[in-house]
Amino acid sequence: MDLAQALAGYAGWLGHGHADRAAAWVARLGMNAPEIDAFRAAPTPDAPVYQAMPTRVDAPKGVGAGDAHLPTDAIEALRRARQRADLNAFTYLPDRLEPAGRGILAGVPIAVKDLMLVKGMPITAGSHAMDAQVAPRDAEIVARLRRAGAVVIGLANLHEFAYGITSDNPRFGRVVNPAAPSRIPGGSSGGSAAAIAAGIVPLAVGTDTAGSIRVPAACCGIAGFKPSYDALPRDGILDLAFSLDHVGPMGRNVDDCAAMFAAMLDLPAVPKWTRRDLGGVKVARLGGYFEDPLDVEVRVALDAATAAAASDGAQVIARDIEGIELAAAIRLNTISAEATAYHAGRLEERPEGYGEDVRVRLEMGMFLPASWYVKAQRLRRVLADRIEALLREADVLLIPTMRAPARPVGEMRAKIGDRDYALHTAVTDFTGPFNLTGMPAISLPWSRSRDGVPIGLQVVGARGRDWDVLAIAQRLQGASPHARA
């Protein structure tokens, strides 16, 4: 009996009514063969399982507030959104805008990812499997932003149910990358990133399960911040994988993200968070897995950022993380179990409503053993302990956001150096580990390739040290070619 027949038989035993899809399941499992092989070979550690716990964000110790220079014309932003319908950046634009509060984002237009409740707007998650039901209330994070004065001008397009990295949406169309139209905008928060990169809005809300804020930020040449796990409330936001999901700000630069983060924390004002220099800061540049392989132009950008950090007073040290190569396998088993469990009822009732790439990934989750999920959480605990130990030695980690700049539209595999990767692996290799650990991480726009494609770099810190991450990233941003352009 071959694998397809075995899976079909098992699916029938489970009561799954679509055993005829066994060939698609086998093909999808084949795409994850490297992760599955690595996971099987890894011994199960004698360690407790990882527990995703909320994080308290430490107060900033900065010298002054950054000036984000945010525009305040929401009506003009809505007009721009309608004019740029070719980008497919939005799933919904309202006929009229709701007035907001008079806080730190007074009058600032924002886009909200179509994965969360916005009162009076229809939530769809970008899927035909969701009826477009008008939200009766705001998600808590949206309510906080409205209290701070932000004006929601629309719902941003995304990869269906936030489960993918291309933002090629089966219901609302493929999001176009304004910075490089022949390249993917990243996902899953592709519409949020595109709306900022096109100058429609200065700020947007995204979610991040394996890089879904930081990857689109890097692809589109903007900034995207994934805060510490559960530092921000996820009430009123659809889950993908509960222990990996984060919500956070996206903006043109680090200063924008900091202003929006303050509003998301429900602070009355943007606190003093910036630094005069990087004196006394220890930066760990990660090698090994994080540099082999690496696109040549991404390496040049990383070298330049490392030099900039040192010239600004930072002490730069070189470090590796033992066992980091298992991060993708740990994430595969975690997200597959949690996402399939969340979608089980809807998938059974309306399977045809899902796009093929998301449907097959959710179906694949039925076939990964429960024991693998537990093993993954034990391995996750070990990995988190190692990275936490490193962040007691260094203040932040400095790495690229992706191994290479945004990939061409339609590409399913990526050749980087002498290695061939499935697209999702190539894109999330450097972002996914920090969803596993719940650590704050920001992708900042650094430079562009010879072809004009944006290159982003990532700064990562210890849980609760979100403002330190933002402050250090802001100093690096000031030295970047992007800032000088």
Task: Please place each PLM-identified region on the residue numbering.
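Short, well-ordered alpha-helical
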Residues: L3-V134, F161-Y163, A485
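Residue-level signal for inorganic ion chemistry
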Residues: L14, A77, F90, C257, ...
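Short helix-loop capping/hinge segments that flank enzyme active sites or metal/cofactor-binding pockets
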Residues: R56-P60, G64, L105-A125, G280-K282, ...
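Acyltransferase
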Residues: D73, V296-R319, A344-E349, Y373-A394, ...
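Short glycine/serine-rich loop/turn segments
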Residues: R84, I104-H246, G288, T401-D420
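Structural helix-boundary/capping segments
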Residues: A143, A198, P202-E291, D303-D312, ...
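Short, high-confidence coil segments that cap the C-terminus of an alpha-helix
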Residues: V201, A394-D395
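Active-site-proximal gating segment of KS-fold condensing enzymes and close homologs
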Residues: I416-T428, G432
